[in-house]
């Protein structure tokens, strides 16, 4: 049962537009959220995914502001997060409202992102980060930052699962970006830490202990963050500021603070025409203030601005950092690595990015990262491709999953796919010539690596990716599987 603090209701009533009803707001807060997903177009087309899952009984209702987003209806026995398709990274379970900020940043499809350098200032768990990576088609550079140590691991796991390869991960208080990467980014998403007032439909206790006195402390951090973002933004660049909270002080007032600080250099962009019906949530400034009852979603706030003029630095330029541990790969190793990936997996490494080496490790960096090297410390850049062995290479799961052509995998059926994801070997029905490292796939999408030994496929799935619980995405198959268990 949802817990709405009466003090919260009294406070938020001051910010609610006159055309909205408090009774309706309270009613919608008590309703469970409709499950929603975003198809990962880095791994499958939206049309192919819909066709594939319609055959399994899934029903889809389009999210108006995201071409790849859908509210879904599935059988109660289907656990979305435990399906093979979810583990493969074919879709992300993402609340519909949280698909809005990336759409606001890029209202039109990006035709060519190779020259773009983006920053996602508060990335975890990765829904918007991976949405941006898909919109960029893994081109250009996306710097994904997360301050919380406990959430960095979750961010990396989701980035890896979704096959995003154009990322560089950082782990900082995002207030440093304006100083260390001054006017370095073409576009920035700041999904700011907030009071979370819009999440009560997902977390019934989110507002149980709501305290108005905490808002100013949160808003103070948000003001610092939006200033840092603005300083890190190139002149002419776009900044989207968003929260999952509802009060004005964490939303409109933070944006107006930036305007008051930097004046005519800040130009607000209206989002009233972002999608059909967006005007229902539009404010006088052109921001979107999404109350739960407007679109039957979580509460959210989204603002977009353009930096129309350069601004002065507010601190000295930091000294360049030294001792970067990576060097460009030598010519001989480069040729051997490229030949191996081409022969084994059909992956053409040339033209994909910058090939780098650290000791016996080989990495693929996004092309645009070089100007940022030495200005800030990265936790991880791009993809680790392989480790060098005495003879040959040991390929990395995440690299092959992100780069390999969909048609290259050894096809498995659903039962075999589930066995594989549980860490088990796959027996072959007839003995064949051993083929070494290979990919296995299910429904045309990759599952991971195996070693083809002739009589079986030896599982090479990293141990941290092995799952104990996996369910079928088909209600009928789930029932059959359950019947077979004792």
UniProtKB/Swiss-Prot annotation:
It holds the Pfam family Methyltr_RsmB-F. This is Ribosomal RNA small subunit methyltransferase F. The gene is rsmF. InterPro entries: Methyltr_RsmF_N, MeTrfase_RsmB-F_NOP2_cat, MeTrfase_RsmB-F_NOP2_dom, Nol1_Nop2_Fmu_2, Nop2p, RCMT, rRNA_ssu_MeTfrase_F, SAM-dependent_MTases_sf. Keywords: Cytoplasm, Methyltransferase, RNA-binding, rRNA processing, S-adenosyl-L-methionine, Transferase. Gene3D superfamilies: 3.10.450.720, Vaccinia Virus protein VP39 (3.40.50.150). Its EC number is 2.1.1.178. It comes from Shewanella loihica (strain ATCC BAA-1088 / PV-4). S-adenosyl-L-methionine binds at residues 122-128, 146, 173, 191. GO terms for molecular function: RNA binding; rRNA (cytosine-C5-)-methyltransferase activity. It catalyses: cytidine(1407) in 16S rRNA + S-adenosyl-L-methionine = 5-methylcytidine(1407) in 16S rRNA + S-adenosyl-L-homocysteine + H(+). The lineage of its organism: Bacteria, Pseudomonadati, Pseudomonadota, Gammaproteobacteria, Alteromonadales.
